[in-house]
Structures are given as C-alpha cells and as structure tokens.
Design a protein with these regions (language model features):
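A glycine-rich helix N-cap at a beta->alpha junction
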Residues: 21-33, 76-88, 167-175, 467-480, ...
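Flexible, low-complexity linker and terminal segments
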Residues: 117-380, 523, 534, 541, ...
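Intrinsic disorder at enzyme termini
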Residues: 571-583, 635-672
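Short acidic, glycine/serine/threonine-rich loops at helix termini
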Residues: 11-15, 43-46, 66-70, 93-101, ...
C-alpha cells in the first residue's frame, strides 16, 4: 500500500501510517508514503506477475497525470492480483486545483471506474468489490471519492481481516517471468486486443453479476433518472425537496444508480431505457461521457426515448443541491403531463426560492471575500515580504518574472504580495521559467517548496536547468514537511512515514547535480534574505543560483510545542513566550506593515486618538511571536510602532522583583 498525499484524500495515508505497526505489519502488508504519484503507481507493478493485491491513493486528476506513465503500463500489461487506485476527486466549490474528471483518464487507459454512493457502508463494500473487479478483468481499478464524501463521519459494519497468501510474512520464493507481460512489441499489440476482447467484457460481466449498479423502479414508468453513484445523495435530496422522494430515497421516478461508471453495461442500461419517454442524466463535470454513451446506445437500439442532461443543469462546476433542485424541477415540469403534478412541483420550488430570499435578506451584507493566505507565523510569508520589499526598493533588480509553484507558497500570488506570474505544476516552477529566462534583461526567479523539490523539482527543474545551463535564481522554501497536504513527511523531514531516518538533504541533492552557488538563509531573517536575493540576482557568476529559505512549518511547530508548554506550566515551571504588539499612540494608520506582511494576526482596530480617523494596526491573541511584523517594519523602514513583550507563566522570585521595580520606575517617570 502506498500513495502521495493531496486533498481531499490526504488523511487516508495518515490512517495507514497510524495502522502500520498495529495492523499492517502483523498482516505482512507493506506500506510506504511514496515520493510521488508515479512512484505510488509503480507499486502496482507487483500485481503484474504475482497474485498480490495492492492499493494506492492520490489527489484527483493532477495525481493521475503524474502517475499516468506507470499506470498506463500497468493497465496495458494487466494484473493478476487486485490493484485499486483510490482517488480524491478534487472537483467543484471546495477544490484546490484543476477542474478535470477522472472519468476521462479511465477512458483513455481502459481502466474500470467506480463512483459509489456516498455512504460509509457503500465505500466499505466497494473497496472489496473493487479488488474483485480488478482480479476478474485483470485491470487496475479506479475508486473515486468526492470532496465532501472524503470528510464524512459515521459508523459502518466491517468484516474480519484476511491474511494475504503472499506478504512480507509469507514471501515469494521464486521470480515469475513472461515476455507476454513486458510492454514491448509485438506483445503490446496483443495486450491492446485483450483489453477490448477479454478484459472490458469481463469487467461488464462482473458488474452485472455482482449487481454493482442499482435499478430502483417507480410508478412513473415513462420517466427515468440515470446518475453517478456519487451524486445519489444530492439527487435524492433534490427530489425530496420537490416532494417526490422520502428521506429513505423512495420515489415514484425510476432511478438507475451507476456505482460503476466505466465500463457501462449496454444490456443493463437498455433494459432501463426501454419503455421510457424522457430520461435525465445527472452527471457532474465535462465532458459529459455518460450522457453521450447513453444517447449512442439508445440510437443504436432505435429506442424512442429523449435523453437530456447538461441543458437542465450546468456544463461545468460542482452539482450542489441548489443547482440539482433547479435542474430536476425543469426536467420534471417539462416531462410530466399532469397539471396537478406540475403545480405541486412548482409550489414546492417557489417555497424553496422564497426561503432563500428570506435568508439572503437576513444577512445585512454579503459575506466578505477572504482570499487564501499564509498561516500566522508561516516561515514562507517573510520570504515573499523580502521579495516585495526588494521589488519596491530596487525595481531594476527585484521587479522580475517570478515562476510560482504548487504548495502553500502559491498563496504568494494573492494579496498583499501578488508575487508569481505563473503556476504550471508541482515542482515545475523552475522548468516553467526555462523559456522565460532567456527573454528577460534580468535574471528571473523560480520558487518551489521542499515537497515540490523532492517530488518533481529536482529532476525536471534543477537537473534540467543545469543541463541547459540556465542562468536564473531558484528559491526553495524548506519547511521540513509537505505542508500543503497536512504536514506529511518528505526527505527534508529527516524520517519517512514509518519513522525511519532518511539521511537526505536538499544541499546534498543540489551538489549532486552540479549546483555550486547555494545559500541557506533563515526564513525569518528578512534583511539577510533581501541581501541574499540581491546577490543572487546581480552576481557575475553564471548558472543556477539557489537560495534555500529554512524555517519549520509553524503549524507543526505549534503542535509540538504547545503540549510541552502546557505540561511545563502545569508542573510549575517558568515558561516564556514572546508576543508582539502595536503601540496605539505611535501607529498612524498607514497600514504599510499589512501591505508587506498579510499576517492573519495583524488586523485593525479603532484609533484611540479622536483626531485620527483611520483605524490603526493591531496584533491579536493568535500571535505566535515569529517577529515578522517587526522585521518587515524595520527592513522596509516603516514606523517604529511595533514592540515585543514576553508573556511569563510561573515567574520566579527574581522575575517578580524585577517586574515590580520596572513598574515603579515607569510609574514615577510617566504618572497618570
């Protein structure tokens, strides 16, 4: 088992890591947090020659794109053991990346795709069915789980674990070799024939015999709704709101729930379509593969049925309840001949619309737009503050093209920094600047995180730049974790997901591919960062210049420190925590500090001076004491309104005495 983390499925790898010692190892199951999706997909190669089951996971189409080389080879050669790919379908309102469908990837490589109903019990069943389907058709199988389903909570009934016949505890004794499983001509031609003559027909038989898709008959026999299994909850909820379904999903409208959306089973779908006049396809995203296939099947079978889909909903975007209810209403009103039914549906829809208007009127103002931002104390923020200060103070040097990358640091493209002219993929920032760099009259900057560096950046970025003698600057943000996915381990962490030491560092890797100009800077030292960036951009030395900005992810740091601090405070030990503030009598309300910082803990409050109308800066209680606000004010030569205090828990006698003396002196010098 393995995979690469990415929302919305990252926590699955956390669960596997937590279960490694207590469950996986005793069963002889191997687990790894892979270096990339391609490495994870290659794990499934074990199932090509041996009856070994394997499961991997990653994020959406972007993960599948990275994995596609290895995955296409596995799908071509075929598998003996069940091979399951669990994909977090990152599509819609909560998505963090490209809006594309796994369905297209499944069609490209002839990989069966499961999209089951979004219930925990259904997921448990279809994991088992997924392995069975894979072994029945000798192909890997995609198992798609949507964003909201990835965050469900609940209970389910499980069955006992079955110890695998081949495992780390029952190892193989001899290798298996067959030229027919090597992806080389002429065997690739035979593999292609097997896909369509044997494997996909076997998949259809399994889907039909095991009843993976669900047909729910209804009294309105002339109508029908075909949907992806993952949209069952939303569709039935929409029917319920229109008065056409109860809370258990019983409805007079016949339903076909496609838990397996590729390959489709023609006889199953034709059996549903026969005798119907109007059928609606509820399919999220484009291209509308299901709608097209259904129309083609009906046309070839010469069925007199009108099939609709996207014209009732939207050609793009997530099918949220409001959109689905509206689409169902349009379809049912146009398809139902009885005036009584139409009136009832329209009345329910009008009541829903009126309720939304009441809610909208209850909100005095629209919810404020809040762009994504760095966390409080994030070590990546000061790096972009330094870039912005350099660009402002010395535009002839600092005002240059910046190739951004995937990660937390992508937020640099947002206000207040607006640093980053392009984002092309994970670890691809440096490679994306290869064509831009020769066209500029100054050096360009590329940015990547340590996660992106180890994933793709070292080979496709750094090695490519060295090979092509690129003269530019690379900034690597080394925060010791793949933080954007949830602080997962990478080689910079020092240990892997199994807590084993790695012995890998970014400087070692850079020197290994020939980089000689390497500078390491504390992320929070803004003046030094500005100076180092200026040196990298102006030095006469040709070739790639790398600036490594080191600073631990603040979220992970606080998770580690706060329990220790609470324990020490409870034990009566003295604990000192730095905090920063803004002197309200000094701050003029200029807000330059915010325009160069953007810290969530740095906010606004009313000025105590009645002659100053503008609100002043204020540091709230979420401050973690990183000091970036003061560093920015100093480096940018801003106002001197920032101050640092120390919050002391369980102060000793000497500390209390000094505090009393200070208060006495201050009171004498500045009487009330």
């Amino acid at each position: 088992m393995g995979g690469y983390p990415g929302a919305p499925i990252s926590h699955l790898l956390d669960v596997l890591a937590d279960a490694n010692e207590s469950l996986l190892k005793p069963l002889g199951i191997y687990y790894e947090l892979s270096g990339s999706e391609a490495a994870a997909a290659a794990l499934l190669g074990a199932s090509i020659n041996y009856p070994v089951r394997g499961a991997v996971t990653w994020k959406s189409v972007v993960g599948t794109n990275v994995a596609s080389d290895a995955l296409s080879h596995v799908a071509s050669a075929g598998v003996l053991g069940g091979a399951l790919v669990v994909i977090g379908e990152d599509y819609g309102e909560g998505a963090s990346i490209l809006q594309e469908r796994t369905h297209s990837s499944a069609l490209k490589s002839s990989i069966p795709l499961l999209d089951p109903r979004n219930t925990l019990q259904s997921f448990a069943r279809f994991v088992e069915e997924g392995f069975g389907l894979s072994e029945a058709c000798n192909e890997p199988v995609f198992f798609s789980i949507r964003i909201r389903a990835c965050h469900m909570r609940g209970t389910l009934a499980c069955r006992d674990n079955v110890r695998p016949a081949i495992s780390m505890r029952s190892p193989l004794q001899a290798p298996s070799f067959s030229l027919e499983r090597i992806n080389l001509p002429p065997f690739t031609y035979a593999m292609e024939a097997k896909k369509f003559e044997q494997r996909l027909p076997a998949a259809r038989r399994y889907i039909l015999e095991r009843g993976l898709n669900e047909h729910r008959p209804g009294t309105e026999a002339h109508l029908g709704i075909v949907m992806q299994g993952g949209l069952w909850n939303t569709t039935v909820r929409g029917l319920h709101l229109l008065g056409l379904a109860d809370l258990q999903g019983r409805t007079p409208v016949p339903l076909m729930i496609l838990n397996a959306i590729h390959p489709l089973v023609p006889e199953e779908l034709l059996g549903f379509l026969r005798g119907k006049k109007r059928v609606l396809v509820v399919e999220e995203g484009m291209p509308n593969h299901l709608e097209r296939e259904l129309k083609a099947l009906a046309h070839e079978a010469k069925l007199d049925v009108e099939i609709g889909g996207k014209e009732f909903f939207s050609p793009h975007g997530e099918y949220v309840p409001a959109l689905v209810v509206g689409g169902l209403r349009k379809f049912l009103v146009s398809a139902n001949p009885t005036a009584q039914s139409v009136t009832a549906i329209e009345d329910r829809y009008a009541a829903l619309t009126a309720h939304r208007e009441v809610v909208r009127a209850a909100l005095p103002e629209p919810v404020s737009k809040r762009p994504p931002s760095f966390c409080t104390g994030c070590p990546e923020r000061p790096v972009f503050s330094a870039m912005k200060i350099l660009r402002t103070q010395d535009p002839s040097v600092g005002d240059t093209h910046v190739a951004a990358d995937i990660g937390c640091h992508t937020f640099s493209t947002q206000a207040p920094f607006n640093v980053g002219n392009s984002v092309l993929g994970y670890g691809m920032g440096l490679a994306s600047s290869s064509a831009v760099a020769p066209l500029f009259n100054k050096r360009v900057i590329s940015v990547m995180g340590d996660g992106g560096f180890w994933h793709n950046g070292l080979t496709n970025g750094v090695a490519n730049a060295m090979y092509n003698r690129q003269d530019s600057v690379l900034v690597i943000l080394d925060n010791f974790y793949t933080s954007a996915t949830g602080q997962h381990h990478n080689p910079s962490t020092g240990t892997n997901a199994r807590k084993e030491p790695t012995g890998m560092t970014i400087p070692q890797a850079l020197r290994g591919v020939g980089v000689s100009w390497i500078r390491t800077v504390d992320s929070y030292d803004i003046p030094k960062m500005i100076g180092t960036l200026r040196d990298a951009l102006t030095t006469r030395a040709k070739g790639l210049k790398v600036v490594i900005a080191r600073g631990e992810c603040q979220l992970e740091r606080q998770r580690r420190l706060r329990p220790l601090q609470r324990t020490r405070v409870a034990a009566g030990e003295t604990v000192v925590q730095p905090r920063f503030g803004v002197d309200p009598d000094v701050c003029t309300g200029d807000h330059s500090c915010m325009r160069l910082n953007g810290c969530p803990s740095l906010t606004l409050r009313e000025s105590p001076d009645p002659l100053r109308e503008d609100p002043i800066a204020h540091v709230d209680d979420t401050c973690v004491g990183c000091g970036v606000c003061g560093e920015v004010a100093h480096a940018a030569v801003l106002c001197p309104s920032f101050y640092q205090v120390r919050v002391i828990a369980n102060p000793g006698r000497w500390t209390r005495l000094v505090d009393r003396l200070r208060r006495a002196v201050i009171g004498a010098l500045a009487p009330a």
